[in-house]
Amino acid sequence: MKTCKLMFLTFSLFLVTVCFQKTIGQSIVALKLPGMDNVIVKKDIPYIKTSDSTLKMDVYYPPNFDFKSKIPAVVCVFGYTNKGQIKAVGKQLRKFGQYTSWCKVIAASGFAAIAYETINPENDLISLMNYINANSGNLYIDARRIGAYSCSANTPVALENILNSSNSFFKCAAIYYGIFLDKDFKYLSTIDTLSRNMLFIPSRLPESTTWKKDVPLLIVHVGKDFVPHTDESLTGFIDKAINQKVPFTLIHYATGIHGFDAYTDNEETGQIIRTTIEFWKYNLKQ
């Protein structure tokens, strides 16, 4: 029985991968804002340099940004390794249309947007945060006003960091069709096996009694997610978040699919994306 469940889950994620690969040219966020085509992009900024490798990030700035003052930023947080990203969509996520267009939407809304490459997602996220803190002046980013965007199997890494009591970097986060991995989640072994195949990091949530309680979350759940067990992972998380008084807003997109922000161009999708932008503006005090 367990083998059948694993095969079904693997097949479902295979369908996600095929869907992404077949629609790479169409993977653009379903919201067009004025100025998106004129945002300023600084590519391939090294944020880690070691004897073995150099990891880079791209920073998107609003159109006509004068580089005279610091602005709030939103980081696209990744949980797939570079190899996993290429396996899933054929290229690094920072170069994938869904994320380049998200970064343009974010920048056109008045923020800086950051997307980066990663070999070790958990450690590299910490290195990225340290780099931004140390270089906020040169980057023209207000390190006191940083938000996050993360979706799908990227979200365990994001949530592990954001809910950690030591987090002083992220001030809010938008989580789209995510996976919430408590230590007692009954499908952990299945997710772990899947993560080894798909090359994403199944980070565990911290112990709920230690969750950071001043980082608002915007959670967007979809009713037609064909990735199994996302419903169970969310309901378990919501119960604990309420008990621990973690601030969150839940949007249940009843007819939404996994990847709706790039693959479902309709008014409801557009409204959810606009709500996400307003969420960042409010919590980052833009």
Which residues does each predicted region cover?
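Short beta-strand element of the alpha/beta-hydrolase
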Residues: 68-81
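Short glycine-enriched nucleophile-adjacent loop
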Residues: 155-166
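Gly/Ser-rich "nucleophile elbow"/oxyanion-hole loop immediately N-terminal to the catalytic nucleophile
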Residues: 69, 130-152, 164
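Alpha/beta-hydrolase active-site loop
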Residues: 98, 119-137
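N-terminal cap/lid segment of alpha/beta-hydrolase-fold proteins
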Residues: 26-69
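The feature captures the conserved acid-bearing segment of alpha/beta-hydrolase catalytic domains
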Residues: 172, 178-244
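Short amphipathic alpha-helix adjacent to the substrate-entry channel of hydrolases
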Residues: 88-113
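C-terminal catalytic histidine-bearing segment of alpha/beta-hydrolase fold enzymes
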Residues: 235, 242-286
